[in-house]
Amino acid sequence: MRTELTPIEARVIGCLIEKEVTTPDQYPLSLNALTNACNQKSNREPVMSLSESEVLDAVDQLISRRLVSDESGFNSRVSKYQHRFCNTEFGDLKLSAQEKGIVCCMLLRGPQTPGELRTRTNRLATFADVKEVETVLDKLASEERGQLVVKLPIEPGKRESRYMHQFCGEVDLDAFQGSALMTASSTAQFDDERVAHLEAEVEALKQELAELKSLVNSLL
């Protein structure tokens, strides 16, 4: 069964996974460090502005579901938190370093193309090329793995499909398809209107030119 998270819980888990790999000497994280990580302006989509209270509420919910643990030492004045989202002794979700990097990046930044994921996971995992990213995505998207990610319809004007995690609930592909079609329709309508406007301007210029020629001829 796939874990289902709220957007704030997804941000908390993503930050804990990220900092576990990129700043291991500062991990587990204090509430202040975790809040700062959640509100980072770089490598986050969308950018959030969460209070410590909001982050703590999410952490408490995750602790109750055994997805986060408080690793504070005895008599410690500051609580320190680490994720138990994957690769725990008794947990069901086991991810390779590459899978973990991709999932982390998606939790922090939402839908992304394989090319974007390869670039953005460079501190989390190593991929030889985009093809290797696609291979890992295919595994994560398989029914055997519980369809942890899903391939989205190609957006109008784009060459690559984006992939989205399903830890915040099952992705409505029909809604994405409808949105893409509406965008394409709006773009086509805008193009038609623009062409019609340009054609009208050309006709007006032709008319003005004809009038100027007529005026010049009358003066000769």
Swiss-Prot record:
PANTHER family: UPF0502 PROTEIN YCEH. InterPro entries: DUF480, WH-like_DNA-bd_sf, WH_DNA-bd_sf. This is UPF0502 protein VVA1225. It comes from Vibrio vulnificus (strain YJ016). It comes from the Bacteria. Signal peptide: none annotated. SUPFAM superfamilies: Winged helix' DNA-binding domain. Belongs to the UPF0502 family.
